């Protein structure tokens, strides 16, 4: 993932192209971001300013050579402090019709499973949802007796305690996105 979305169009495309030139011979794909993703805390002020322009997205993919593209369609990173997401599905459809690389949905956490499912139906092929998974993991940690009793829990043990929460939430997203059976995690009913 090469996030240069805060830079100008030209500089973003140029830097992503540099990464692509380094990574391609090694068989490494390059994901780029075009159109910034707001943070939940400034979502209402920044949402419209950050939206990806579909025509510019096509040009960006052509200039940068990226293998997949994260676009801004009204989502945010992290938890929303005000009003929740207002996803622009028509914008996503326009982008999907114009670009020929897989699309990525950053800020999946707290964007709503219905919104994510619709984005996947339209053509999004990757959804990032780290904050949501972290929260489920932390919930496991905070409810663990060893943590509650003040025991010294190192990073390794904390990770082991948090893993079931991560896994549970990732599996929820896999079901919503239609990814079950297309990955290494086995879901048991």
Task: Locate predicted features.
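Alpha/beta enzyme core
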Residues: 2-101, 113-124, 129, 142-143, ...
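Thr-Gly-centered strand-to-loop micro-motif
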Residues: 105-107
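A hydrophobic, small-residue-rich beta->alpha segment in the mid-to-C-terminal subdomain
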Residues: 123-156
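Extended, intrinsically disordered, low-complexity segments
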Residues: 144-189
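Small/polar glycine-rich anion-binding or flexible loop at a beta-alpha turn
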Residues: 109-115, 133-137
